[in-house]
From Swiss-Prot:
It catalyses: a quinone + NADH + 5 H(+)(in) = a quinol + NAD(+) + 4 H(+)(out). Keywords: 4Fe-4S, Cell inner membrane, Cell membrane, Iron, Iron-sulfur, Membrane, Metal-binding, NAD, Quinone, Translocase, Transport, Ubiquinone. Gene3D superfamilies: 3.40.50.12280. This is NADH-quinone oxidoreductase subunit B. GO terms for cellular component: plasma membrane; respiratory chain complex I. It comes from the Bacteria. [4Fe-4S] cluster binds at residues 36-37, 102, 132. Its EC number is 7.1.1.-. NDH-1 shuttles electrons from NADH, via FMN and iron-sulfur (Fe-S) centers, to quinones in the respiratory chain. Couples the redox reaction to proton translocation (for every two electrons transferred, four hydrogen ions are translocated across the cytoplasmic membrane), and thus conserves the redox energy in a proton gradient.
Length: 161
């Protein structure tokens, strides 16, 4: 039946597959730039790298308008409640990219008393981008991994922290 309809020019899919495809192609990121990794993240939106090719070029100013939070840099204990508050203001479905060694696990400041040893202790992280600071290409790879995760996994199975 599907081959017959495909030959006639029809496309068979489920509504879930269509929604996953649409969400993966139109990510609206919000920056949570805390340190030097934010400079590399800003570079991604420039004309040399053109993040808009992946449907994620325009950074949103409000958490209510975005569905991807990119945490870039060192997260301090005083900033952790603000990060969680901004995350809670985002509409479902929402995703988090942890960018850089400091956001992933504390990085260079891992043993400092005022540093959170990874933003995954505050918000659930979907993709980790390694590096100090990670290059623009590494962030692109992380965004592509997030797109694949959105497209091929059920997004409502995740339990938030």
């Amino acid at each position: 039946m599907q081959q017959l309809l495909t030959k006639e020019g029809f496309l068979l899919t489920s509504l879930d597959d269509l929604m996953r495809w649409a969400r993966s192609g139109s990510l609206w990121p919000m920056t949570f730039g805390l340190a030097c990794c934010a400079v590399e993240m800003m570079q991604c939106a420039s004309s040399r790298y053109d993040l808009d090719r992946f449907g994620a070029g325009l950074f949103r100013p409000s958490p209510r308008q975005s569905d991807v939070m990119i945490v870039a840099g060192t997260l301090c204990n005083k900033m952790a409640p603000a990060l969680r508050k901004v995350y809670d203001q985002m509409a479902e479905p929402r995703w988090v990219i942890s960018m850089g060694s400091c956001a992933n696990g504390g990085g260079y400041y891992h043993y400092a008393y005022s540093v959170v040893r990874g933003c995954d202790r505050i918000v659930p992280v979907d993709v980790y981008v390694p590096g100090c600071p990670p290059t623009a290409e590494a962030l692109f790879y992380g965004i592509m991994q997030l797109r694949n995760k959105i497209r091929y996994r059920n997004i409502f199975d995740r339990k938030d922290a």
